[in-house]
Amino acid sequence: MTEDVFEYSAAKMRKHGMTDMAIAQFRRLYEVWRNEEASSWIREDEVEPLVSVPSFHDVYETINHDKAVDAFAKTAFLKLNGGLGTSMGLDCAKSLLPVRRHKARQMRFIDIIIGQVLTARTRLGVDLPLTLMNSFRTSKDIMKVLQTNKKFHQEDIPMEIIQHQEPKISAETGMPVSFPANPELEWCPPGHGDLFSTIWESGLLDALEAQGFKYLFISNSDNLGARPSRTLAQHFENTGAPFMIEVAKRTPADRKGGHIVRDKVTGRLMLREMSQVHPDDKDDAQNIDKHPYFNTNSIWVRIDALKAKLASYDGVLPLPVIRNKKTVDPTDPTSEPVIQLETAMGAAVSLFDGATCVCVDRMRFLPVKTTDDLFIMRSDRFHLTDQYEMEDGNYIFPDVHLDARYYKNIHDFDARFPYGVPSLAAAKSVDIDGDWTFGRDVMLFSDARLEDQGEPSYVPNGEYVGPQGVEPDDWV
């Protein structure tokens, strides 16, 4: 029965020009979902906490920095760049979103990524190829940026690979959903775990090996902290491991996220998402002292090891299936309920004997998922250096909550900060409730709070905002 129903999805994918690899990958996701295998728990008594993870600072103090350039010269760089930023109201690649100014130029994510690559090439005298995993929706605009950048050149290594698409599935029937009002919404990406089959199908690994590259560093395009590092390249080479995940220490804000554990039977590392945690194990899983490390989604892989692993599975790795319950039109909760089937890139760690982790500081984990994150990134907490590093004093940021009614959409957000976001240098937390527009040179301090006035409101130029709202001058 499952096979018969799946054939409707396969036929739809063929009609739209999807490859056999894309169909094979989706077939596996679909069959796992229909057989309920995806709901298997990773029980607390089956795993051990991850302990004794070397830190970036320890690694930096112990490696041979001259030798590190040699390891770095054998490293290629891949950025996951398929996201549209729909959570912020964008209809284009999120990496085209302006982040901050540098020498009077407005810099987007993609500009900073290119700057990081060009700086590394120049300073260290290495090739450092950059490949972007784009989607059908992001490819055209992003490739135009790369091809019109007069300083960025690359031969023999492709600048992009295109991630697959799959049909959204009706939650009721298991059939591919139909949405004539906007047929594009009938499709979704298979999650960043799709990277592996896309790499296999594209021939990227062969191209890299032919040019003498041995290592591949992969990270998200919205994480500007995950820049190329000769220190980590040398450490990865020293370990001899086939696969390395950059992890970071969990904070209370991270307690509901996925974390890294070790399988008691196999000894292999595992990425355990909260959807894989049994209800009886939830307290243990959310205990950040017991399970102190989370996955930053930045990984290092040995090209030969990844190539061999993919060959053994015909290009489709058996990763745990994530089932996302949504509506076909994500902006309309009354539209048809659908299932989107995905896999996570970091889950591949469990397939490799000898995989390892390295603990990095928050300076290498600066994701921008919402306008709350962008608010901090655009503030005076950060300085974009000439090496295109997002630099902050301690990388301990204020807890920011902006009223989603007025700030979630990037166009609404920009309209309310016409002179840029306020100063956060003295802010411990920020809570803005209601429709507030900010003048020039506004400073937020302590636990800054603005309450909803029931109408559009304005913070004048040069004002201070603290726990009592806009503070009278004699209070400051």
What are these regions (language model features)?
Residues 89, 93, 101-104, 229, ...:
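Short capping/connector residues at structural and topological boundaries
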Residues 1-79, 87-215, 421, 426, ...:
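Conserved N-terminal catalytic core of the sugar/cofactor nucleotidyltransferase
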Residues 1-76, 234-476:
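Left-handed beta-helix
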Residues 78, 97, 131, 160-162, ...:
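Hydrophobic/aromatic beta-strand patches that form the interior of the parallel beta-sheet core
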